[in-house]
Each structure stands twice: as structure tokens, then as C-alpha cells.
């Protein structure tokens, strides 16, 4: 069962060939400008692995006229987009970014951690844009254990956490390293159900057509995109199955 697929309503029967044609036509749209492609996709996954190519370059090469590897990062400061976590890490439209914030992280920071964050935030606001080295030099936070069991600069880890919580935004990159600026906050979406439906629609725009199981898993991944609404995911998934078209493909 694919959800959604083609223009058929719920549980229509379609052939595998028809689904393939639809999938190709839907995702490989006519090459356009970089801003329009990002707006259409809503989200572009980022991955630093360069073999065979980085994920963002593989995605955009066939969807942007005259695209060259690295164009996204080079033009990022002027594109009006953000680096952020959606169902995984990547580049998101400003509209999607606003939907996910203000974000309440599941990992609760103690008062001492927040005090450090506010000191760094004041420093960033004073400087405008900062490289992690500048923060480390200013505050000398030392080292911390990273996700892989190794050692990382504690300042870098703090900046990552501040970025995820919406205190900072990525202003640009220098040699692949994120440089940060302060991010101005805004009010939370007044209608949680509508906001969750909009997040689900970004998943559909990016990944459909796809099997119901895969679709359901991606909706559950919204726990990282909007942890403050993690309890609203099941209801959003149920609404999506009611409002989005689906199909049985070759009897499956």
C-alpha cells in the first residue's frame, strides 16, 4: 500500500508501472532555480560524505539548472533558508523552520547549562557571527565526550545544543564548520494540529509516493523536529491517513 500515490482516492488499485511513472514525474520535476527547488522540496538532507557525492548535491543536481557541487553552501547566506533538523539534518525553508520553533528539547538543561548558553548568546549578539573557535577561546569550556565516545570541544557541543533549541542559526560555513548568529524567537503556532499537519505535508511533498510503513516511520521521526509536540504525532498520522490519497499497488 502506497500513501499517497497518484491522484487516486483511498485504496484505489494501480499498477506498479503506473506508480513508477508517477514517482519519477513527481520527484524529478523540471530543473528550476535553486531557491525554487528548495521551496518545492521544503527540505534537503545534508550529508558530508563525499562518495559518490554529498546528499544535498545529489538531490539538487537533477533539479536545479546548471547546479554544481557546493553551490548550496556557497549561496546559503543569501538564499533565505536555514540549516536545521527535520526528520534528519539538512537545509529547510524558512516556513518549515518557523513551524518547528520554539523547540523544547527532550534533554533538559540544568540552570548551570542555561547560564553558559546565555553568556554565549550575549557574546554572539555582540560579535554578530562567530566561529566555534572564537567561543572556545573566549570561554575556555574545555572538552566533553561526544556521541561517538570521543572527545570534542565543549563549546562546539554547547553551540550545537543552542542551535537545536533555536537560540542560534547557522549564518554560513567556513571550511565546512558552522558559524553562528543569534536567532530572534517568535511565538509558537497557535494550532498544534494544523502545525503538525503542515509538517506531515512536508514529508509527503519530499518523499511520496512511499509505503504506509515508511510514511508512518517518518511521521514518528517528527519527535526530533518538534519534540514539544511528540504526543501529537499519532493523531497527525491518523488524520493524514484520512485526508491523503492512497492506493493498492499490484494487489499489495
PLM ranges: what are they?
Residues 6-252:
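Long, low-complexity intrinsically disordered regions
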Amino acid at each position: 500500500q502506497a500513501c499517497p500515490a497518484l491522484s487516486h482516492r483511498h485504496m484505489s488499485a494501480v499498477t506498479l508501472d503506473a506508480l513508477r511513472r508517477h514517482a519519477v514525474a513527481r520527484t524529478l520535476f523540471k530543473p528550476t532555480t535553486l531557491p525554487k527547488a528548495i521551496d518545492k522540496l521544503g527540505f534537503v538532507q545534508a550529508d558530508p560524505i563525499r562518495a559518490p557525492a554529498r546528499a544535498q548535491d545529489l538531490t539538487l543536481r537533477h533539479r536545479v539548472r546548471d547546479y554544481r557541487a557546493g553551490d548550496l553552501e556557497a549561496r546559503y547566506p543569501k538564499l533565505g533558508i536555514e540549516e536545521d533538523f527535520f526528520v534528519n539534518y539538512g537545509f529547510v525553508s524558512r516556513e518549515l523552520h518557523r513551524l518547528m520553533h520554539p523547540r523544547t528539547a527532550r534533554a533538559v538543561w540544568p540552570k548551570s547549562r542555561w547560564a553558559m548558553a546565555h553568556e554565549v548568546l550575549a557574546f554572539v549578539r555582540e560579535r554578530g557571527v562567530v566561529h566555534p573557535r572564537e567561543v572556545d577561546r573566549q570561554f575556555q569550556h574545555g572538552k566533553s565526550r561526544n556521541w561517538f565516545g570521543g572527545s570534542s570541544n565543549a563549546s562546539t557541543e554547547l553551540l550545537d545544543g543552542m542551535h537545536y533549541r533555536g537560540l542560534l542559526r547557522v549564518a554560513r560555513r567556513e571550511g565546512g564548520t558552522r558559524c553562528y548568529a543569534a536567532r530572534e524567537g517568535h511565538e509558537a503556532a497557535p494550532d498544534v494540529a494544523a502545525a503538525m499537519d503542515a509538517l506531515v505535508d512536508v514529508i509527503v511533498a519530499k518523499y511520496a509516493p512511499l509505503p504506509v510503513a515508511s510514511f508512518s516511520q517518518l511521521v514518528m521521526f517528527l519527535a526530533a523536529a518538534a519534540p514539544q509536540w511528540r504526543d501529537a504525532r499519532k493523531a497527525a498520522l491518523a488524520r493524514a491517513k484520512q485526508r491523503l490519497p492512497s492506493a493498492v499497488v499490484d494487489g499489495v
